[in-house]
Design a protein with these regions (language model features):
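C-terminal outer-membrane beta-barrel translocator/porin domains of Gram-negative envelope proteins
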Residues: 1, 129-306, 318-319, 326-328, ...
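Gram-negative/organellar outer-membrane beta-barrel architecture
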Residues: 1-160, 166, 278-279, 289, ...
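Short secondary-structure boundary/capping segments
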Residues: 55-59, 253-256, 333
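Outer-membrane beta-barrel transmembrane domain signature
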Residues: 278, 323-340
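Strand-loop-strand
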Residues: 334-355
Length: 388
């Protein structure tokens, strides 16, 4: 690292089932004269499944253990243990992803010096083999997109803001292949509107969509923090996202919104954007059996600092928030929201980043459930800022 330039190399693995590697470079003063940023990154990941024999043998193992448990406890000694997870690794069921991106950003002088404009050109390739957890199960899918973002930030401190605001408006757009490739995508469907899995796999060889997002946060100290450093701070937020299509017969299952929980679904969110909403299970607010093509989230949070040092920040918080997701843009309703409330704590350490834990209670019923979201604990680790 020199002159603010950053090179990041990371790797993550879960034995043979999941591997992820990435490398990125960021220069905040590209050219050395003006605050123009430049970035380039690449990543690769692979996730595999287990054989269906695992579930069959698990049933077999549990069944016979229940029979013989009264005759010497065979199950206790793991005789014929069919549940050894490693033995069911199936390399023929997998999803691989790799991608490249290059970005550029510029600080604007109008309307004021707090505005920035950035652009990123990205390419991702998905290679799926008998992957049953997504609408596309086999094939190769390509995603080329241009992301434009207009943002403004006037906060006084990135770790514990006490005044100012942040907002961003972004558009992520792919080429409209269906408008010029000459294919009859309606013909991929049966007369009753259904579609075979083979046709579904062919439908998304080249992914197309346009994605729009708006996010805003404000920070207000409830006392003069220059004389009362430990003043309470009120943070308010509002955000929404829409995923549109050029052709109604080619709606993208990629880049959809996965709403609910702590926003830390990890490597399972390979083709979706995770949106946190505390007080509910992960992904529980996305309509069951479909994708989220629209979402909204809003909330207020009251923060109290326990320690504000150069290298360490600790604060506690209480919050009210609400949000929801819809499987069609036309169903978007900012007044149909799932509500929650809770408390939490945040600790920032230089070598780790932000850590925290929240307890939240969801007051409303979710899709496919007759009960309210209920009580949940949520964790914040590293640089993830989905719930902070």
């Amino acid at each position: 690292q020199g002159d603010g330039q950053t090179l990041t190399v990371s790797g993550q693995t879960n034995a043979r089932y999941y591997q992820s590697y990435s490398i990125s470079f960021f220069d905040p003063w590209f050219g050395g004269k003006r605050p123009n940023s430049f970035s380039v990154s690449a990543f690769y990941s692979r996730q595999t499944d287990i054989s269906s024999r695992y579930y069959n043998d698990s049933y077999y193992n549990n069944y016979y253990n229940s029979i013989y448990s009264g005759y010497g406890g065979y199950g206790m000694y793991n005789y014929g243990n069919y549940n050894n997870y490693e033995n069911y690794y199936d390399p023929d069921k997998s999803i691989q992803m790799w991608g490249l991106s290059i970005g550029w950003g510029k600080r604007l002088k109008w309307p004021d010096d707090y505005f920035t404009l950035s652009a990123e050109l990205a390419y991702q390739r998905y290679i799926l083999k008998d992957w049953q957890y997504f609408p596309v199960t086999d094939g190769k899918c390509n995603n080329i997109s241009l992301n434009l973002t207009l943002a403004r930030s006037s906060i006084d401190n990135p770790l514990f803001p006490r005044q100012g605001s942040e907002f961003s408006l972004s558009a992520q757009i792919t080429p409209p292949y269906s408008l010029f490739d000459g294919r009859d995508y309606k013909g991929y469907y049966n007369s009753n509107g259904s579609i075979t899995q083979d046709n579904r796999n062919k439908l998304y060889n080249w992914i197309e969509y346009h994605k729009w997002k708006f996010k805003a946060k404000t920070y207000t100290a409830l006392m003069d923090y220059t004389t009362h450093p430990k003043s309470l701070v009120l943070m308010s937020r509002v955000e929404f996202g829409l995923l549109g299509h050029y052709n109604k017969y080619k709606k993208s299952p990629f880049e959809t919104f996965d709403v609910g929980g702590d926003g830390m679904t990890g490597y399972s969110s390979y083709a979706t954007e995770s949106i946190a909403l505390r007080g509910y299970e992960n992904s529980s607010l996305t309509p069951y059996g479909s994708e989220g093509y629209a979402y909204t989230r809003l909330g207020i949070e009251l923060r109290y600092p326990l320690m504000l040092e150069t290298s360490t920040n600790i604060y506690v918080l209480g919050f009210l928030e609400a949000g929801n997701a819809w499987n069609d843009i036309n169903k978007f309703n900012p007044f149909d929201l799932k509500r929650s409330a809770g408390v939490g704590v945040r600790i920032f350490l230089p070598m780790i980043g932000m850590m925290g834990i929240d307890w939240a209670y969801g007051f409303d019923k979710v899709f496919g459930s007759s009960s309210a979201g209920g009580s949940h604990f949520h964790f914040v680790l590293g640089d993830r800022k989905s719930v902070v």
